Curated annotation (Swiss-Prot):
Belongs to the PC-esterase family. Signal peptide: none annotated. This is PC-esterase domain-containing protein 1A. It comes from Homo sapiens. CDD domains: SGNH_hydrolase_like_5 (cd01842). PANTHER family: PC-ESTERASE DOMAIN-CONTAINING PROTEIN 1A, SARCOMA ANTIGEN NY-SAR-23.
Amino acid sequence: MVFCLSSEEPRRPLRSDMVHFQASEVQQLLHNKFVVILGDSIQRAVYKDLVLLLQKDSLLTAAQLKAKGELSFEQDQLVAGGQLGELHNGTQYREVRQFCSGSGHHLVRFYFLTRVYSEYLEDVLEELTYGPAPDLVIINSCLWDLSRYGRCSMESYRENLERVFVRMDQVLPDSCLLVWNMAMPLGERITGGFLLPELQPLAGSLRRDVVEGNFYSATLAGDHCFDVLDLHFHFRHAVQHRHRDGVHWDQHAHRHLSHLLLTHVADAWGVELPKRGYPPDPWIEDWAEMNHPFQGSHRQTPDFGEHLALLPPPPSSLPPPMPFPYPLPQPSPPPLFPPLPQDTPFFPGQPFPPHEFFNYNPVEDFSMPPHLGCGPGVNFVPGPLPPPIPGPNPHGQHWGPVVHRGMPRYVPNSPYHVRRMGGPCRQRLRHSERLIHTYKLDRRPPAHSGTWPG
């Protein structure tokens, strides 16, 4: 978004508590967490940088950023779509990836989306209903929505945004934190693969459409009490880190994005972070602090009993909801495969319950050896936390951007237990309760074919 200041005072950097995370700290923050990332190729790069940062303190290579649908990336695996199917730039492209750490205490999954709400997204939500409940969902969809679905794409995008937030509110458990990543700024010349040659005349207006779409998505996410990370704001001065295609970004930008995202998540979970002094980022300038419609935040306490900290703490109005174009699933009996005992960690080699609706067929009966991953049919269970990261005592200030949130800061039992739309927030069912209310779709193509790794 663009903010105009009436004052002639020079701009000054905005102080924030953004932390430059090390791999060991990311491992602690996401210990026993299931992270789901949904979106386009930029969100795939978000997934890749997070997977890499969970393992080592290094940056993605240009080849890794450019790769699409590869069979394996940094110990992850391609579950469906990509090279297992057909590589193309159509709206039916699918790619599902998953990373499970060797310890079994970190699970990250990625679904490629070409539209924010669709029949395919309903299949993804169905899959998440049967499997372990996500602890963190990171989602964005904008560029495809505004460029590949006809003349009324903005109107359709607004309707689909409302639908997706309603469905996320219905499906995700109370313990899940959802972060909506706003679309990053585009270049003046756009040659990204999502924009077909015959659609190049749209490139000029697409930059303005993204700003408008960001406004609608942030407003709706905030009204549904979901978090918003304004990447358009944060990266508007970082043009030297944007690729020549006008859409994608280099490895330095994506590592900065990961730091922003993880700082946001840690703050929402109430996790104490290591405080190290950093100089101002030379490629990020922020406006002076001002009122913003999406400022404020809410916290979510960790999903297990012991206090989670990377270091010891220091002493001291919208339109009514749109109708759904796809029939919503009806309740059905609980799944035939009950969850494993609650003291079982998420280790490789455990099978994922087969679903009779896995009939979509890019590749029949796909499976991977057990040592390559872990089956998501097991609930995450708290395990002992790794020891705190040794480091210097907190000192100094950090420089970084503002995180825009939808709700004022306070400490409830869950991140979304707030008043919304003039009434009390409806309590979402937790995963154990939702097992009674699971549903099956009527012969709808699943989010992926075959079996989950393991």
